[in-house]
């Protein structure tokens, strides 16, 4: 059972370790999200996000009574550069939008529905905050994530070519009407 909650400030090192392990564990596999250490996501972004209370973690028991981070994501109102040029379906002011960043699950927990549980938690957070839309993006090559988002009710709002210039990648833009 996955327990989703906000990461605490004293968990910043565990959050950083989670993303390092997730990237390393997926590299070269069919689940590779093509993220780069300290580029996407950067440790500065993750530290600032934990400090701001924007990181949500999905916790599981490790079998010995302790918990570990199996999934994580950042939720804030900050769309990346280029979000303003997308033809979103929901007309919403920036403060009416929740943006999902760097959703990931450790490979050891794939196939258990944890990413879906994280997305459901994200929608709950948006509703509770009175948001009108949840928005996110994913690399065009990340077909598994696209399938997940669409199965969760997110609408495909098109492709932004060269969206991640620093990584040389384009992105598919998604939106959920809250």
Describe every region a protein language model picked out.
Residues 52-73:
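Conserved beta-hairpin
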Residues 1-13:
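Conserved N-terminal entry element of GNAT/NAT acetyltransferase domains
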Residues 126-137:
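Conserved GNAT acetyl-CoA-binding A-motif
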Residues 66-67, 74-102, 110, 164-167:
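Conserved acyl-donor/pantetheine-binding loop and adjacent beta-alpha core of acyl/acetyltransferases
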Residues 92, 139-146, 150-152, 161-178:
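C-terminal "cap" of GNAT-fold acetyltransferases
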Residues 43-57, 77-82, 99:
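A short helix-loop-beta-strand connector motif used in the catalytic cores of GNAT acetyltransferases and
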Residues 105, 111-124, 147-151:
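Conserved acetyl-CoA-binding loop-helix of GNAT-fold acetyltransferases
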């Amino acid at each position: 059972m996955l327990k989703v909650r906000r990461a605490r400030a004293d968990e910043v090192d565990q959050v950083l370790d989670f993303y390092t392990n997730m990237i390393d564990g997926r590299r070269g596999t069919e689940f590779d999200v093509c993220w780069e250490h300290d580029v996407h996501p950067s440790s500065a972004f993750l530290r600032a996000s934990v400090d701001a209370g924007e990181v949500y973690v999905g916790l599981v028991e490790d079998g010995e009574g302790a918990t570990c981070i199996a999934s994580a994501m950042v939720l804030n109102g900050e769309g990346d550069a280029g979000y303003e040029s997308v033809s979103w379906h929901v007309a919403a002011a920036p403060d009416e939008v929740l943006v999902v960043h760097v959703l990931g699950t450790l490979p050891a927990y794939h196939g258990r529905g944890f990413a879906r549980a994280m997305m459901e938690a994200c929608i709950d957070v948006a509703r509770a905050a009175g948001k009108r839309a949840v928005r996110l993006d994913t690399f065009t090559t990340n077909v598994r994530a696209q399938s997940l988002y669409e199965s969760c009710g997110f609408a495909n709002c098109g492709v932004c070519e060269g969206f991640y210039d620093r990584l040389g990648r384009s992105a598919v833009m998604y939106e959920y009407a809250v």
